[in-house]
Amino acid sequence: AIQAHNVANSGNISSTKSQIQVDAIDIQNSGLIATSDELKLNAQVKINNDTGVMNAGRIDLSAQNLSNAKGQIQQTGQQELNITAKTLDNRQGVIGQATKDNTSGNQTGTTAPPITDPEQNSSAQDSSSITVAEPIDLTPKTFDAGQIQIAQDIHNVSGQILNNADITLKVQDSIKNIGGEIQLPELQFNGQNFENQ
């Protein structure tokens, strides 16, 4: 866990197995923060991920103001991500479930590897050995349920808020979704202004 007054990352903070937790007044990321486990950021004032990338098995962000302009906040796990903020600026940003890149074509699925006769073209001799590997725990990790809860405003201009899990977006004041995309199972809006173009 990192605890500081201000945290600024323009490089790489990553972990292959452990949770990354940062507690600060302000957190600024223009680099990469990644883990296969949980990424938990708690800022008393602001999380600024403009042009930055956050990628984790589960994402849990809490701040008064969250800015993700041209940034990416991607969750690779199937659990619900959790974002709590007073305001969210997601102009040209992406928030949600990480997707596979299909820009090289419209191929779907996987291609089976060719199957060959193991004795054909084998150069193996009778001096082989067998090593027993230690067992690996393959139990999937479970995380807390989450939601995206914004107390005031969302500015999702040309941005994307996507998630294929059963997650709710709750907004109390206004949504500005101009040229943006919001794909979530549920949207609860109790505010004054909803602009969707």
Model-identified regions with their sequence ranges:
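Short, T/G/N/S-enriched strand-turn elements that build extracellular solenoid repeat scaffolds
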Residues: V7-S15, Q28-A34, N48-M54, N68-Q75, ...
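Well-ordered beta-strand segments characteristic of repetitive beta-sheet solenoids
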Residues: A1-H5, S18-I25, D37-Q44, G57-Q64, ...
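Polyanionic, low-complexity segments and short acidic motifs
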Residues: T111-E119
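Compositionally biased, low-complexity segments
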Residues: G11, P118-E119, S123
